[in-house]
Swiss-Prot record:
Spans annotated as Disordered: 27-48, 99-179, 292-403
Tissues in which the UniProt entry reports expression: Highly expressed in vascular endothelial cells and neuronal cells.
Natural source organism: Danio rerio (Zebrafish)
Name this polypeptide is given: Fidgetin-like protein 2
Primary localisation category: cytoplasm
Pfam family, one: AAA
Function: Microtubule-severing enzyme that negatively regulates cell migration and wound healing. In migrating cells, targets dynamic microtubules (MTs) at the leading edge and severs them, thereby suppressing motility. Negative regulator of axon regeneration that suppresses axonal growth by selectively severing dynamic MTs in the distal axon shaft and growth cone. Contributes to proper cell branching during endothelial and neuronal development.
Enzyme class: hydrolase
GO cellular component: cell cortex
Cofactors, names only: Mg(2+)
Source organism, top-level taxon: Eukaryota
Ranges of biased composition (kind: Polar residues): 27-41
EC annotation from Swiss-Prot or TrEMBL: 3.6.4.-
GO molecular function: ATP binding; ATP hydrolysis activity; microtubule severing ATPase activity
Taxonomic lineage: Eukaryota, Metazoa, Chordata, Craniata, Vertebrata
Length: 684
């Protein structure tokens, strides 16, 4: 009976019934095989014992004898008998006829009623094996031995006594398992174009030529291996022919590299003798167990890189141990211990194998402990490493060591009596000295509040002027603006103490202020220090602070007699500012502000007379003048002694005349002239 699909030319081909072997579940295949000597013949016979309407085909080649084909079929019939009876899940292809396991090819062309060959690969790439299955073919066999997930496949060349280790890798050239091949499928029809990936050790087409010799083409050689593996990594494969080497470079596709230097996981090649007596099910079970063991071993993914052989990995090229996918180990107790995940296409090296192949020492990442503790790397544990690690500790020790050496009594004296915690006036509320405030803002406030490497603010300042000019108030407001602790010490009180006690107190003050930065120390009446030893100690402290730009420490000294300061001590001040008495506008502002609660009843002429008479008064003395005038106004009102007045009356000009008799300025004209002359020479 002639099949309507079989061409007439195929019926003339030679066919020997000895090579016919019925298959239970393989669909109809029509092959047109070209041969140099003779043409193969195909003949289909309906296998009536099967109820599913399957066909059995016999195929023969004139290149081998019938006896050789019978021996080969007998040898592999027992091996594949159990696999052929297993059910095969056919893919749904709509209205097409039922295809075989891999589809059919007719003379290299797909018939219009047959679907395209399907594989088990989900990425749509070409299969590792040809999309057809041939029956009763002798010669070497190419059988996949991979039991890994889709995308990873192993190929082994099988013959009578040959075994080859399958090279595996993350590839889309994944063919079906050995259970899905016909009993005597020959690798002759396996073209190199079916496998675009370099991960499979698939020999070229010339390796699969039909030979009566049962060995695997001893004449096959190549000069350029597909992978640039080191010679020490892969042992000699005794099962292969002596002249057989890896496939040539043309099997590598252009978009992919030949082989990365770093390969994933601690994978090893397993030499499996597929051509032996071990069944394919055992091979698949072994490969599956090896895959599970590799997945369970987290440490194999975090080893040093080397040229370890590859092994079947997961279906994803990037293996992340952590389920969250963020690269951090979930079982780590170290909150800062980062364990990077390496891709499965890379391999790692055991700790004892470090430097075995590369000859270099491994780079050990620095260990970070909890609470910010830092441990230097192994390369920094020498002198440099210890210095870098102890920099912050040494700096803290420098700050804390002076505090430990301070006498507790002196420390308590500085903390309780010398530290001034009284509220300071706002910088904008300071009356008078507008030019001095502007100079301090430019020289000190802006460089401190907005640091600039090119601008260094002054660390030692001298404020000189008559008594009551507001030098202390200005210094206190300045410390409040820069957010520094304020310490105040009178040099007149310091000079009255014993020499040893005065020096110890001065040293304690500077030590505490240095340890509690930012800080400001105000030394008033600095001209009172006449003792040589105490003056030299103060001079040494000022020079130390002046040349150390990293400290947030400011020293302000005030004096009303700058002419009495020694020149050696005077040179220790970076800036010198003259704080004079308030002028007419400042005095007017102070008087009106002080009289605002009761109201000012003075006329403009009377107010001008009061301002003219108050020349030489300081701000503090002007406030005393206003208070005395208010008291005089309250006393002149006829109010009973024990009764409260309805409202306080505003002072009159007569009240101010009475106040001038009781409040007098403390600065002398000689003192004012001295400060003015000294300011012209030494003031900045």
């Amino acid at each position: 009976m002639l099949s309507p699909i079989v061409p007439y030319s195929l019926l003339k081909m030679h066919w020997n019934p000895e090579h016919a072997q019925p298959l239970s579940q393989w669909p109809e295949q029509h092959l047109d095989v070209s041969s140099t000597t003779s043409s193969p013949a195909h003949k289909s016979e309906l296998y009536s014992s099967r109820g599913r309407g399957s066909y059995s085909y016999a195929w023969a080649n004139d290149d081998i004898s019938a006896l050789t084909a019978s021996n080969l079929l007998k040898r592999y019939a027992e091996k594949y008998s159990g696999m052929l009876d297993s059910p095969y899940e056919r893919p749904s292809v709509g209205a097409y006829p039922e295809p075989g396991a891999f589809g059919g090819l007719n003379g290299g062309q797909k018939s219009e009623l047959e679907p395209w060959p399907l594989t088990h690969s989900t990425d749509g790439a070409y299969s590792l094996v040809p999309p057809s299955s041939h029956e009763s073919l002798s010669g070497p066999k190419v059988v996949p031995t991979s039991a890994g997930p889709p995308g990873s496949g192993n190929v082994s060349a099988v013959n009578s006594n040959l075994s080859d280790s399958g090279y595996s890798g993350s590839s889309s050239c994944s063919g079906p398992h050995s259970s899905e091949y016909p009993p005597s499928y020959n690798g002759t029809y396996l073209s190199s174009g079916y496998c675009p990936q370099p991960s499979s050790a698939l020999p070229p087409a010339s390796l699969h030529a039909l030979q009566p010799n049962p060995t695997l083409l001893p004449s096959y050689t190549t000069t350029a291996p597909v992978y640039n593996y080191p010679p020490s990594t892969y042992p000699h494969q005794t099962g292969l022919a002596p002249s057989y080497t890896h496939p040539t470079a043309p099997y590598i596709p252009s978009p992919l590299p030949s082989r990365p230097t770093v390969v994933g996981g601690s994978y090893g090649y397993q030499n499996s003798s597929v051509g032996g007596s071990e069944p394919g099910g055992s091979l698949k079970r072994k490969a599956f167990e090896m895959t599970l063991d590799e997945e369970d071993s987290d440490s194999s993914r975090y080893r040093k890189y080397s040229y370890d052989p590859m092994k079947t990995g997961g279906d994803s090229p990037y293996g992340v141990t952590d389920k969250a996918g963020n690269g951090f180990g979930t079982g780590s107790t170290d909150p800062q211990g980062f364990k990077p995940s390496k891709p499965s296409s890379q391999s790692s090296l055991e700790g004892d194998e470090v430097g075995k192949y590369s000859g270099l020492k491994p780079l050990v990442s620095p260990t970070y402990g909890a609470a910010g503790d830092y441990s230097p790397p192994a390369a920094m544990t020498g002198e440099n490493g210890g210095a870098e690690q102890g920099f912050s500790q040494n700096r803290s020790q420098k700050r804390s060591d002076p505090m430990k050496s301070i006498e507790p009594r002196m420390l308590e004296l500085v903390s309780r009596e010398l530290q001034d915690c009284s509220p300071a006036m706002l910088w904008t509320e300071l009356a008078g000295n507008c030019h001095i405030k502007a100079a301090l803002e430019e020289d000190l406030l802006w460089p401190v509040l907005r640091p600039n490497p090119a601008i260094h603010p002054p660390k030692t300042i001298l404020l000189f002027g008559p008594q009551g000019g507001g030098k202390t108030t200005l210094a206190r407001s300045l410390s409040s603006q820069i957010g520094a602790s304020f310490y105040r010490l009178s040099c007149a009180t310091l000079a009255s103490k014993l020499k040893g006690e005065a020096e110890q107190l001065l040293l304690t003050l500077f030590s505490v202020a240095t340890a509690r930065q930012p800080a400001m120390v105000l030394l008033s009446e600095v001209e009172a220090i006449e003792e040589e030893g105490l003056r030299q100690q103060l001079q040494a402290q000022l020079e130390k602070i002046q040349h150390n730009q990293s400290n947030q420490f400011l020293v302000v000294c005030t004096t009303r007699r700058p002419d009495l300061i020694k020149d050696s001590l005077l040179r220790c001040f970076s800036k010198r500012y003259h704080i004079g008495l308030p002028d007419g506008n400042t005095r007017r502002h102070v008087l009106l502000q002080a009289l605002a609660p009761q109201g000012c009843s003075l006329s403009e002429r009377e107010l001008s007379a009061v301002l003219q008479r108050s020349e030489g008064f300081s701000v503090w003395e002007l406030l005393q003048l206003c208070q005395q005038a208010l008291a005089s106004a309250s006393a002149s009102a006829s109010v009973p002694l024990h009764s409260l007045p309805a409202s306080l009356s505003s002072p009159t000009l007569q009240d101010f005349e009475n106040a001038f008799c009781k409040v007098r300025p403390h600065s002398t004209p000689k003192e004012l002239d001295t400060c003015m002359e000294w300011s012209k020479v030494y003031s900045h």
